[in-house]
């Protein structure tokens, strides 16, 4: 699945920021939540100051699927974790990097989702890695078509994972 994942990253084209640049070359931040279902939403990169908004929207946990140091304008996960903890939100660092998807990442995602007291917010650079880990964590829990449809409704094509998602 690693090769599949790398190809997907190259072709994704989505950005965690809205694409505009300011005078300092940093992305102009826009929080763009995409609802997968009543329990999970995803987006691209967030900033520590977004945590208060996430809390006000009713999220109880944050899953960070982006490795630190992936881009120069990316905040450290520790800063987002500190903001989450200060706001009373659970925080899970489950980075999906160049080594690709593996069973441990999927299991950790499933555990974090199942252990949450309420809605969970997941992020990476574009939301694609977060959606991929969510989809794979649902294998065997929901029909493959339902998983793929929920992701598609949020704007993510997970049809390439159908063989990994199990029952139809």
Regions found by a protein language model. Name each.
Residues 5, 16-120, 132-168:
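Cys-dependent protein tyrosine phosphatase-like superfamily
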Residues 124:
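Short cysteine clusters
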Residues 127:
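Substrate/cofactor-recognition hotspot
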